[in-house]
């Protein structure tokens, strides 16, 4: 049985051919890396479709290499970015802002321990909807619900 998310997120409108949805996650906590890997694998994503990095600079480096090297198979373009706001090297908000500036149509999901009241102006300025913010600790079904939502246009 094919998981719903694979059908919803990976259906190509240009052809019948299936395109994998790729997810890049910036999260400093290695225990949470394991959870993301389990969650996404359980929901039908292959290991090659999901990459988890420990900091914002590595995330931005991957994005930069994608844009400059079209033959780089390891780092093909990502469709969804899940960014923790409390990264150790650079603010997750800054990472999200740089992604939005470079890739304006890509989906960005923030994870945070801040309350929505404390970050609403920051997410508005980046162009992230409050529905695309996960508040830690979150449960698996919260992540699935966000991933199941159709992608949004951000212009």
Predicted regions and their residues:
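Two-component/phosphorelay signaling modules centered on CheY-like receiver
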Residues: 30-54
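Acidic, metal-coordinating helix/loop segments flanking the phosphotransfer/catalytic sites
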Residues: 37, 52-80
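Acidic catalytic/metal-coordinating carboxylates
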Residues: 55, 91-94
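Active-site residues of response regulator receiver
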Residues: 83-85
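The feature encodes the CheY-like receiver
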Residues: 88
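Short amphipathic alpha-helix used as the core "switch/output" element in two-component signaling
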Residues: 93-105
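Hydrophobic/aromatic residues positioned on beta-strands within the core alpha/beta folds
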Residues: 110-113
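C-terminal output helix
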Residues: 135-147
